A protein has these predicted regions:
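Long, contiguous binding/interaction regions
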Residues: 1-159
Length: 159
């Protein structure tokens, strides 16, 4: 996203796929920055997970723990952009970029399959963001030789 005007350049980690950065517009015109997450997103990742409702945590991630330790968040951001990928949806807020959704994949062994998960903060449900995150994750996976994304969803998850 360093190609977006008025946005400061942020150092990218080795192997960072800048080609996956782009802006997406919701139906109401809100700009959402779609990009791979980076280690410097640590505080935003912690706030994102802690801001999810218990229902969203349970339906999307099958657990209800709302507290995330710094070490847990660091593990979530320890991605290599090949076998492990995390794509974030971020919006500009007065305090900086805020994560409002994340899609992830983890390659299964050394195969062309990966497990995936998507979670969107409650305020953004029903706006097409989950679909857009899945589309972005699919593009990233395909470019890295992953042909199948597998995910688990609870039956009561109707969103």
């Amino acid at each position: 996203m360093n190609d977006v005007p008025n946005r400061p350049a942020v150092p990218r980690p080795p192997g960072y796929p800048a080609d996956l950065e782009r802006d997406w517009h919701t139906a109401d015109g809100t700009v959402v920055h779609i990009r791979p997450l980076r280690p410097d997103d640590l505080e935003s990742e912690i706030q994102f997970v802690q801001g999810l409702s218990e229902q969203t945590l349970y339906l999307r991630l099958q657990y209800s723990m709302r507290e995330v330790s710094r070490a847990d968040a660091e593990r979530l951001l320890a991605i290599d952009y090949h076998d492990l990928m995390a794509i974030g949806a971020l919006v500009d807020e007065p305090q900086g970029e805020t994560i409002v959704g994340v899609s992830r994949y983890a390659r299964i062994d050394d195969s062309d399959r990966a497990e995936c998960a998507i979670v969107v903060t409650d305020a953004w449900h029903g706006r097409g963001l989950g679909t857009e995150l899945m589309r972005s994750l699919g593009i990233a996976a395909r470019a890295r030789g992953i042909r199948t994304l597998e995910g688990t969803s609870l039956g009561e998850n109707q969103r």
